[in-house]
Amino acid sequence: MPLLDSFTVDHTRMNAPAVRVAKTMQTPKGDTITVFDLRFTMPNKDILSERGIHTLEHLYAGFMRNHLNGSQVEIIDISPMGCRTGFYMSLIGAPTEQQVAQAWLAAMQDVLKVESQEQIPELNEYQCGTAAMHSLEEAKAIAKNVIAAGISVNRNDELALPESMLNELKVH
């Protein structure tokens, strides 16, 4: 099985909250697609609550689009990581980590302005697979933590696992 890009970086050395360019690729027509690792918590140290990350998923995608989309950038998708330490964001374009961090902070400020569960988009059984699993309070706590900590940048060259370690860790 091929090794996925996200598993070639040392999760024990990641900062959080932090932005990392996880992957960049070109479409056949020449457009740039960039995948960002938006790490909210330190891997293997903390996880986002299931209700908080789910509510954030509903709010964050829209708020990030409001702050980052433009003539050079269009967000394709923002999805929570299975490990519940952050989100992956795929987009057309190549914004800088600083632009993404600024949009992320602005989106967290927007989360704090949501006044009630009724203002959470698509929170109903027709548009959400687990409509009962939400907590605006927990989403706001996550947002407050990000704002208080600030957002740094994780760089692949600083986090790369050595080839010898990748071979040692390989599943046989």
From Swiss-Prot:
Keywords: Autoinducer synthesis, Iron, Lyase, Metal-binding, Quorum sensing
Cofactor(s) the record lists: Fe cation
Coiled-coil segments: none
GO molecular function term, any single one: S-ribosylhomocysteine lyase activity
Reaction equation(s) it catalyzes: S-(5-deoxy-D-ribos-5-yl)-L-homocysteine = (S)-4,5-dihydroxypentane-2,3-dione + L-homocysteine
InterPro entries named in the record: LuxS_sf, Metalloenz_LuxS/M16, S-ribosylhomocysteinase
Cofactor descriptive note: Binds 1 Fe cation per subunit.
Role, per record: Involved in the synthesis of autoinducer 2 (AI-2) which is secreted by bacteria and is used to communicate both the cell density and the metabolic potential of the environment. The regulation of gene expression in response to changes in cell density is called quorum sensing. Catalyzes the transformation of S-ribosylhomocysteine (RHC) to homocysteine (HC) and 4,5-dihydroxy-2,3-pentadione (DPD).
Protein name as catalogued: S-ribosylhomocysteine lyase
Protein's organism: Vibrio cholerae serotype O1 (strain ATCC 39315 / El Tor Inaba N16961)
